[in-house]
Amino acid sequence: PGLDDKVLTEWNGMMLATLAEAAALLQRPDWLAAAIKNGEFLINQLCTESGSISIRRSWHQDGNPRAQHAALGADLAQLVDGFTRLAEATGHAIWITHAKTIADKLLSDYWDAENGGVFTTPHDGEQLIVRQKDVMDNATPSANSTAAFALYRLAGLTGDERFTHHADQILQLLSHIAA
């Protein structure tokens, strides 16, 4: 059978958040070191800057390591959550900087200015008949539920009310579904 060696940004963002929080709660420096290594990999391999940050959805190690496919809203939301939790666990400002940069990208490229919430694809992505917006959690949390939680945490660390405002708008959107 073939080997599936791809690294998914969304899932690694979830793992980053989990490792960082567990390391802090259980006082496990080895887990914190693994979280830092994961965070560095995500920044170095899946986030590139060429005038503006570009985040990729997956990475392959098939003899020619490469990142490919534009990220989805869930990828960015999970990265914001992961880097925010890593900042909380380490106390290092660099992770807040990464979380803020990615949150800014999420809000500039994926935000639905008309109805609130995060679209699945960026504004400059493939033009589909309907632009999807995940609002229900499935096997993984939706981009919108993750973004709301991550933006509130990031607002708490940075004092940036923009993040609180956008998180509030996401919860307003989700409240219509929960009602």
Predicted feature locations:
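Glycan-recognition and catalytic cores of secretory/periplasmic carbohydrate-active enzymes
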Residues: P1-A179
